[in-house]
């Protein structure tokens, strides 16, 4: 049976996807590392000599971007991904599981051979979650992520999910990793005078539960990712770097595009993200007008390598 992500989301289910990590560096030759693992410039500090902007030295790919190609040849596609410059991947739970027909240890071994790290995965948290957490912890993954909960009808419904997230967070902690929730647009649309995203963030344990900001899905309903990053410092630890077509109608969800060709100001957003605790920058793309999935993720990698903020 073919895994249908959109159908799964519409039914309000919790499905699966993937992940990535971050490293940041200034762009001059003389650098020193601060306590947060960020490379900073030193030496000649004249404006003409030093470019003080930062760049990402490490970024990842959400494998759902290649959902039509990956199941046919997991190892071959992953090898291509590594050749584009991605250092991390975030998986998702397809018909072959989050390790794509391999055991969790064999998947890690293959990642090591490619010079990549499996940082995280989206998964169906309602099925065999303890087993998944055990396997993820065993191979050093950092996160298991709930990709969706569907739009809820009441504030209390969101509070119930917050309680669930806390339980998932405890299970992850026991296995040496963390739990996160990946947003869609509905948590940034008011419900009974409250914002569902606030409800989830204010009712979860910051010691065990983090959030993955899908920047596209924050912008689509009209919210401001910068404001949310500043409102909840150190809660958004991962993000999906996903651009939005400039010509897309307001609130249109099927509107992602190659990075740098859309309407989202990533230099500004990612700078604020880094300053407020973001660790993992994960590319995701779901639409490929005039291109192919594999070509688009190659183009996206080039954008990420050249991005400065």
Which positions does each model-derived feature cover?
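Conserved, mostly hydrophobic/aromatic
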Residues: 61, 81, 111, 136, ...
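Hydrophobic faces of well-ordered beta-strands that scaffold small-molecule active sites
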Residues: 57-62, 89-91, 118-121, 144-146, ...
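Active-site acidic/histidine proton-transfer and metal-coordination neighborhood
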Residues: 18-20, 51, 117-211, 294
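Acidic-and-aromatic substrate-binding clefts and catalytic sites of carbohydrate-active enzymes
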Residues: 66-72, 92-103, 122-131, 151-159, ...
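Short, low-complexity, disordered segments immediately C-terminal to signal peptides
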Residues: 27-48
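Acidic/histidine-rich catalytic cores of soluble enzymes
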Residues: 88, 176-263
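N-terminal export signals
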Residues: 1, 7-27
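Acidic (Asp/Glu)-rich catalytic clusters
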Residues: 50-54, 78-83, 99-117, 130-140, ...
């Amino acid at each position: 049976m073919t895994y249908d992500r959109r159908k799964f989301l519409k039914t309000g289910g919790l499905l699966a996807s993937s992940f990535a990590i971050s490293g940041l560096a200034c762009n001059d030759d003389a650098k020193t590392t601060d306590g947060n693992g960020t490379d900073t410039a030193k030496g000649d500090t004249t404006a003409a000599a030093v470019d003080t902007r930062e760049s990402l030295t490490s970024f990842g790919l959400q494998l759902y971007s290649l959902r039509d190609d990956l199941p046919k040849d997991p190892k071959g596609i992953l090898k291509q991904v590594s050749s584009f410059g991605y250092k991390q991947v975030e998986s998702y739970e397809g018909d072959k599981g989050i390790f794509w027909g391999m055991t969790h240890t064999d998947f890690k071994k293959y990642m090591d051979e490619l010079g990549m790290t499996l940082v995280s995965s989206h998964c169906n948290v309602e099925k065999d979650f303890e087993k998944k957490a055990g396997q993820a912890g065993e191979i050093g993954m950092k996160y298991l992520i709930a990709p969706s909960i569907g739009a809820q009808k009441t504030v209390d419904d969101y509070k119930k999910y917050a309680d669930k997230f806390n339980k998932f967070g405890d299970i992850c902690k026991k296995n040496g990793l963390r739990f996160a929730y990946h947003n869609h647009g509905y948590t940034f649309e008011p419900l009974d005078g409250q914002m569902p995203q606030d409800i989830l963030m204010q009712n979860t344990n910051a010691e065990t539960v983090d959030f993955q900001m899908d920047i596209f899905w924050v912008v689509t309903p009209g919210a401001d990712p910068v404001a949310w990053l500043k409102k909840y410092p150190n809660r958004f630890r991962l993000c999906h770097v996903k651009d939005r077509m400039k010509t897309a109608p307001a609130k249109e969800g099927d509107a992602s595009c190659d990075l740098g060709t859309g309407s989202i100001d990533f230099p500004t957003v990612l700078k604020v993200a880094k300053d407020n605790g973001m660790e993992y920058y994960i590319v995701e793309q779901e639409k490929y007008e005039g291109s192919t999935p594999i070509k688009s993720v190659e183009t996206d990698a080039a954008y990420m390598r050249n991005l400065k903020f």
